Amino acid sequence: MEHARLFAYDDWANREVVSTLRAEGAPAPALRLLNHIVGAQWVWFARLRSKEPKMDVWPELTLEQVERELEELRRGWRDIWNRAIQGRSIEYRNTKGERHTSRVDDVLTHVLMHGTYHRGQIATLVRQGGSTPAYTDFIHASRSGAV
């Protein structure tokens, strides 16, 4: 399956989480994890473009700011597909300052899995708070035509 479709799913799932947190009230730990998803995506996006990240991996954003950042990221990831950098490798420093080289495809897969992992944590927090978490299963997105 191509990364572009999976990033469309990732964007949809993040927006579903935003909608749920807005409707149910965003517990601070859940919002912090959603912020981390956004911050980490900006860090990886910057690494792919050999630029400095817009924010760190644990930013403090409101739900409204998260929405705006997700919209900007959606456009940015589309630009990545247009630049056709898949199949290449990038060199970067991690948050500890250690130098690494990774395949772009591996970075993209990591970004997707990272978001899925933390959305699962958010779902647990929402459920523990007595609310129903966003239904973000990929198959649901596919069946509903979201991706």
Predicted regions and their residues:
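Short, contiguous alpha-helical
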Residues: 4-57, 96-147
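Helix-adjacent hinge/juxtasegments
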Residues: 53-94
